Amino acid sequence: MASLSQSESGRLYSWWWDSHIPKNSKWIQDNLADMDSKVKTMIKLIEADADSFARRADMYFKKRPELMKLVEELYRAYRALAERYDHTTVELRRAHKVMVEAFPNQMSFDMIEDSASSSSEPRTEADTEALQKDGTKSKRSFSQMNKLDGTSDSHEADSEVETLKRTLLELQTEKEALNLQYQLILSKVSRFEKELNDAQKDVKGFDERACKADIEIKILKESLAKLEVERDTGLLQYSQAIERIADLEASISHGQEYAKGLTNRVSEAEREAMSLKKELSRLQSEKEAGLLRYNKSLELISSLEKTIRDAEESVRVFRDQSEQAETEIKALKQELLKLNEVNEDLNVRYQQCLETISKLEREVSHAQDNAKRLSSEVLAGAAKIKTVEEQCALLESFNQTMKVEAENLAHKMSAKDQELSQKQNEIEKLQAVMQEEQLRFSELGASLRNLESLHSQSQEEQKVLTSELHSRIQMLRELEMRNSKLEGDISSKEENRNLSEINDTSISLEIQKNEISCLKKMKEKLEEEVAKQMNQSSALQVEIHCVKGNIDSMNRRYQKLIDQVSLTGFDPESLSYSVKKLQDENSKLVELCTNQRDENNAVTGKLCEMDSILKRNADLEKLLLESNTKLDGSREKAKDLIERCESLRGEKSELAAERANLVSQLQIMTANMQTLLEKNSVLEKSLSCANIELESLRDKSKCFDDFFQFLKNDKSELMKERESLVSQLCKVEEKLGVLEKKYTELEVRYTDLQRDNKLKSHQVEELQVSLAAEKQESANYKRSTESRLADLQKNVSFLREECRSRKREYEDELDRVVNKQVEIFILQKLIEDLEQKNFSLLIECQKHVEASEFSEKLIAELESENLEQQMEAEIFLDEIDSLRGAIYQVIKALQVEADCKTEQKITKDQISVSRALGEIDSLKGSLSSAEYEMHRLVVENSVLLSLLGQFQSDGLVLESEKNILEKDLKTKIHQCGMLEKDKQDLQEANRLLKSKLIKREQQEQKLRAELKFENLKFESLHDSYMVLQQDYSYTLNDNKTLLLKFSEFKDGMHVVEEENDAILQEAVALSNTCVVYRSFGSEMAEEVEDFVETVSSLREISTGLKRKVETLEKKLEGKEKESQGLNKMLENLQEGLEEDNFLTGLLEHQVSNVDEILEHREMEILEAEHMLKATNNENEELHKEVEELRKDYEDSRRMRANLEWQISELSDVAGRQEEEIRKLNALNENLESEVQFLNKEIQRQQVREEYLSLELQEKSNEIGLWDSAATSFYFDLQVSAIRELILENKVNELSGVCENLNDEVVTKTTKIKQMKETVGFLESQVTELKSQLSAYDPVIASLAGDVKALEKSTHALTKFPATAYQQRVGNNLEESGSTTSPCNGIVILKEINPSIKTIEQAFVKEKGRLSRQITRSTSQKRRDRRKIENIQPDDQVTGESRQPRLRPEMTEVKNELLMKDNPRDQVTDSLTYGRSQGTSHGSNDMFEFWDESAESETSVNFLINSNKPQRSLNSNLRHQSRNPSIESDKAVGVVDKLELSRNIEDKAKILERLLSDSRRLSSLRISLTDLKRKLEMNEKQRRFSNADLVIVKRQLKEMEEAVSQLENTNEILSKEIEETGDARDIYRKVVVEKSRSGSEKIEQLQNKMQNIEQTVLKLEDGTKSKGRKMFSETRTVILLRDIIHKGGKRSARKKKNRFCGCIRSSTKEE
C-alpha cells in the first residue's frame, strides 16, 4: 500500500514537482547559471597575478568593490534558492498534513515535524524581495492543492500521496546537491574574502611602513646633516690649527735655514782661516805655528759667537711670530671651548626634554590604567543592568527607536565615528560570531544527516523533537525567573556604579588638566631655553666680530713680518698663503654660527611639533579609552545574546507561524539596514584609516624616542672626537714647546757662533795685516785657492737654493702626512662605530628571530583555533541569521557594558555557553598577544629601518670621503708632475683645484637638497620599499668595495708618503727619521691589514644580517596575510552575527513585556543621543584628518614615480663610479710600481748619503790632521798638497751628490752633537800632537847626544887628554839632559849644525893622519902582532873571570824572557831591521866607527832608561874611563883601539835595536791610550753594541800586557849590555837573538794594533774608507818617526844594514 500511495502521490504532484526540478525550472537554471558565472569571474579576479606583491595588493585594492558586489550578488542568489527551498518544504508539509488527515493510517507525522524544523531556520533581510515572490508562488500552489483536495476523490488522493513521496525523495537528493553547492560556494567566498582582507591589510601595513619610513628618513637625514655640519666644523677647526702649526714650523724651519746659512758662512770663514794658516805655516817656524793655530781656533770660536748674536735678532722675530700664532691658537681653543659648552648645554636641555617626555608618557600610562580600572568597574555594574527582559522591552520599541535613529543618522552623518571606536569591539564580536557560525555549520551537517535518514527515523525524530521542545520551554521559564531576580540586583547596583563613574571621570579630568598645565610649563621652559640659545648665538657673533678685528690686526702685523722676512731673504708668498687660510677660517666660523642658528630654530620647531603630538596623543588616548569601554560592553552583550539564542531555540518551532505577519515590517527595516550597512562600510573604512593614523602616531612617538637616543649616542661620539681633537691639540702644543726649547738652544748656539765668527774675522784682519808683505810671494797660491773658493761658493749658493725649495716641499709633505693621519684616525672611529652598530644589529636580529618563532607558534595555535571556530560557525550560521538585526539595534540602544564576572552566575544548564565563552576569552587573549607581538615586530622593523637609513647616511659620508680622497689623489698626482715648475704654475693649479672643489661642493649641496626633497615626498608602498632595500644592499656592496679600494688607495698613499719621507731623509741625511718613517709605514700597513680584516668581517656580518632580515620580512608578510585572512573571516562572521541578532531581537520583541522596558529605554536613548552628539564632533575632526591623509597618500603615490626615476639615475651614477674606481685601481697599480722603484732608489741614495756623510766627517778630521802635520814638519806640505787634490776631487763628487739630494736641513740636536764631536776630536788631536812633540824631544836630545859622541870620538882621534875630554863630555851630556825640554828642540837642532861641521873636519884630518900612519907602520907589524898575542891571554883570563859573573845573569834574563813570552805573539814575519853581520867587516871599517858607536851607546842608554838617566850616564862614563886606563896600563894603543872598536860597534848595534824597539813600544802605548779614550767616549754615547766593546777591550788588554812584557825584557837587556860592556861573542849572540825576537813580537803587535784600529773605525763609521784613512794616519805617524829616527837605517838595511845614513855617506866618500 505504501508503494501504491507513493506512486499515486508522485503522479498527482508531478506537475508541481516538475516546476521545481532545476532541469524544468527556468528560474532555478538562471540562478544557478548566474551563480556559476559570478564564481568564475571572482576566481579570475583573485587568480590574476602581478609582477610584485605591492602591485598585486594595489590590484586587489582596486578590484575590491567589484569583488564585494559579486559576493553580495552571489549571496543573494544563494539566499533566494534557500528561501525557495524553504517554501517548497512548507508547502510539502501542508500537503502532507492534508494527506495525513485524509489517510492517517498510510502517512506518518515525521514529514511534518521535519519540514517544520527545517522551515524554522531563519534567513536574512537582504533577500526579502525573493521571499515575497516565493511566498506568493507558494500561496498560489497551496490554494491549488486545496482545490484539488476538495474536488478530488479518495483514489486521486492515493495517487497524489504516492507522487508526493516520490517527489520527497527527489527533493531530498536535490537538497543534498544544493547543500553541497552551497558549501562549495561558501568556501570559495571565504577564500576570496580572506585574500581580499590579506590584500587590504598588506596595503595598510605598507602604507604604515612607508609613512614611518618617510618620517624616520626625514628625521635621520636632518640629524645627519646637522651632525655632518658639526663634524665638518670640528675638522675644519682642527685642520686650521694644524695649518697654523705648520706655518709656525715653516717659520722655524726658515730660521733653521738662516742659521744653516750662517753656519755655511762660518765654514767659509774657517776655510779662509785654514788657507791663511797654511800660508803662515810656510813662513813661520814650528813653535810659532803651533801657538798661532791655537790662538786662531780661539778667535774662530769668538767670531762664531758674534755671528750667532747677529742671528739672535732674526730668531727673536721668528719667536714673535710663534707667539702670535700661539695667541691665535689660544683664541681658537677658547672658541672651541665655548662651542663645546654650548653643545653640552644643548645636550643637557635635550636630556631634560626627554625626561619630561618620559614623565608625560608615564603619567599618560597611569591615566590609561586608571581609566581602564574605572571602565572595568563600570562594566561590572552595567553587566548586571542588561537583562533579557530589558532587551525584550527594547524589541517592542524597536520600530520607534529605528525611526529616531534614522532621523538622527540623516541629520547627523557624524554617527559614523561611533563605529570607529567600536572597531576593536567588532573584532571580538567577530570571534564570537565565528564560534557561533561554526556551531551553526555543525548543526547544518547534522540536519543533512537527519534528512538522509528521514524515512527510516521519522517517528523517532518526532519524539526527540517533542522532548526537546518541552525541555526548551522549561529552560525559557527558568530564564524568565532568573531575569526577574537579576532586575532587582541590577537596579540596586546601577546607581552606585553611575556615581563611581562620575567620580572617576572627574578625577581623571583633573589629572589630565594637571598634565596639560605641566606640559605648558615645560613648553615655556623650552621657549626660554631657546631664547637663551639665541642670546648665546648673538654673543658668539659678537665674539666672531672681535676675532675678525684681531685677524685684521694680525694681518697687518703679518704684512710687516712679510716685509721683514723679505728683507732677510725668505719668500713672502708662503706667508700670504697662510693669510688666505686665515680668511677662509673666519668665513668658516661665520658659517658655523649660521648653522647653529638654524639648529636652534629647528629645535624650537621640533618642540612645537612635540607639543602638538602630545595633545593629539592625549585626544587619541581618550578615544581609545571610550572604544575599550564600548568593546567590553559589546562583548557582554554578545554573551547575553548567545545565551538567549540557546534558550529561544526551543521556541522557534512555535514562532515560525507568526513570522509571516512580521515580514511586512521587516521589508521596511531591511531597506533601512541596507542604508545603514553602506554607511557602516564607509565608517569601517574611516575607522581603519583612523586606526592606521593611531598606529602611525604611536610609531612616530617611538621613532622620536629612538631618534633621541640616536642623537644622544651621536653627541657622545662627537664629544669623544672633540676630546681626542683637544688631546691632539695638547700634543701639538707640547711639540711647539719642544720646538721652542730647541729654538732657544739654537739661539744660544747661534750667539756662540756669532762670537766665534767675529773673533775669526778679527783674527783674519790681523793676519791680513801681518801677511801683507808676504802676499806677493804667495799670489799664485792665493789665486788658485780663490778660484776654488768661488766655485765652492757658487755650488754652496746653488745648494742652498735647492735646500730651501726642498725644505718647503718637505714641510708640505709633512702637513699632508698629518692630515692623512687625522683621516686615518677618523676612519678608525667610523669603523669602531660600524662594528658596534653591526653588533647591535646582530642582537636585534636574534631578538627578531626569537619573536618570529614565538609568533609562528602563536599563529599556528590561532589557525587551529580558527579552524575549529569556523566549523562551529558553519553550524550556527543558519540559527544566527534571525538574530543579527535585533542584536545590532540592542547594541545601538543599550550602549552599556557588561562585566566578565557574570559568568560565575550562569546555571548548570548553560555549561556549553560558558565553555564557548571561555574559548572566546582564550582566543581574545591569544589575539591580543598576537597583536602585541605584531606591534613589537612593527616597532623593531621601524628600528631596523632607522638603522638602514643610518647606514645609508654612512654610505653617503663614505662617498663624500671617497670624493675628497679622489681630489687629494688628483692634486698629488698633479703636484708630482709639477714639482719642477715655477710658483706661478702651482698657484694657478691651486686656483683651478679650488674652483673644482667649489663646484663639487655646490653639486653636493644640490644633490643633498634633491635628496631631502625626495625624502619628503617618499612613499610608504612596498614597491618603493623593496626597491630601496635592493638599492641599499647594492650601495652597501659598493661601499664595501669602495672601502676596500680606499684601503688599497691608503696603502698606496702610505707608500707614496714613505717614498717622499725617504727622499727627504736622503736630502737631510737624517738616519733617525728614516727609521721612524719606516716604522711608521710598518705600523700603518698593520693597521690597514687590520682594517681590511674588520671590513671583511663586517661584510660577512652584513650579509648574514641581510639574509636574516629578508627571512624575517618574508615571515612577517606571511603572518600579515594570515592575520588579514582571519580578520576578514571575523568581519564576515560579524555581519552574519548582526543579521542573526536582528532576527532574534524581533522574536524577543514579541515574547517580552513591552510597556515596562519602553519607558526605561527611552531615558537611556536620550543619554545615548547626548553621547552621540559628543562623539559626532570628534568624528568630524577625524574625518577631516582622514581626508588629509588620503590627499597625502595620493601625493606619496605621485612621488613614487619620481623616486623610481631617481633610483635609476642613482644606479647609472653607481656604474660610473665603478668605472672611475677601476681607473683609480689602475692608477694605484702604476703608482705602486713607481713606489717600488723609488724605494729601491731611496735605499741606494740612503746608502750613498751615509757614505758621503761619513766621508765628510773623515775629510773634516783629515783637514785638522794635515794642518797639524804641515805646521810641525816640512815634508807634510807635500802630503797636504796631495790631500788637497783628493779633497778637491771629493768636493766635486760631493757637489754632484748634493744636486741629487733633496734637503740638507740638519736639526739642532745633530748640530750640537757634531760640534761636540769636533771639539772632542780637536782635543784628541791636540793631545796626539802633544804626545808626538813629547816623542820628538827625546829623539832630538838623542841626536844631540850622538853628535856629541861623534865630537868626543873625533877629539879622541885628535889625541885630546882623556880626563879633560871626559869632563867636557860629561858636562855637555848633563847640559843636553837638562836642556832637552819640549820647547828647546829647535834650538838644539840649530846648535847641532856647527858641531857636525867640526866633526866632518876632524874626520878629514883623521883620515889623512891614518893613511900616513899606515904607511909608516909597515915595518912595525910584526912587533905589533906580538904585542897583541901577549895581550890576548890576558884578555882571555879577564874574559874567563868575567864569564862566571855574566852567565848567571844571562840565565836569569833568559828564564825571565821565556816566562814572559806569549806564544800568540810569535809570528814568522820579516824583521823591521836587518840581521847584523857580526864581525865580517874589515878592520878598517871597525877602526873608522868604534868611536862613533861608543858615543851612540851612551845616547841609546840615556834614551832607553829615561827614568834613570843619571845612572846610565855614569855607567857609560865608567866604561869610557875604564878603556883609557887599560890603554895606559898595557901601552898597546892601536891594537886595543881596534879590539875596543869592534866590541863597541857590536854593542852599539844591539843598543840601537833595543832603542828602536823601545820607541815602537812607546808608540804602541800611545795608540793604546788613544783607543781606550775613544772607546770610553763611544761607550758613553752608546754607539757600539756590548759584544763589540767586549771584544775590542779584551784585545786591547792583551796588547797592553804584551807591551808591558816587551818593555820589561827590553829594559833588562839594555841593563845587561850596559853592565857587561866587554862581553864576548856567545853572550852577545844571545842578546842579539833576544832583541831580534822582541822586534818581531813588536811588529806583530803593530799589525794587531792596526787591525784593532780598523775594527774600531768600522764600528764608528761603518765604512772601509774610514779604516783606510785611519790606517794612513797611523802609518804617516810611524813613517815620520822612522824618517826622523831610523830612515837611514831602512836604506842601510838594504845595503848591509848600516847604522846611520850620514855616516854611511861618509864611508862612501872615503
Curated annotation (Swiss-Prot):
InterPro entries: NAB, NET_actin-binding_domain. Belongs to the NET family. One of its GO terms (molecular function) is actin binding. Plant-specific actin binding protein. May be part of a membrane-cytoskeletal adapter complex. Disruption phenotype: No visible phenotype, due to the redundancy with NET1A. Net1a and net1b double mutant shows a significant acceleration in root-cell expansion. Expressed in root meristems and at very low levels throughout mature vasculature. Residues 113-159, 1409-1448 are annotated as: Disordered. Residues 152-446, 474-546, 579-883, 974-1021, 1095-1259, 1285-1336, 1559-1665 form a coiled coil. It holds the Pfam family KIP1. GO terms for cellular component: membrane; nucleus. Residues 122-137, 150-159 have a biased composition (Basic and acidic residues). This is Protein NETWORKED 1B. Residues 13-92 form the NAB domain. Keywords: Coiled coil. It comes from Arabidopsis thaliana.
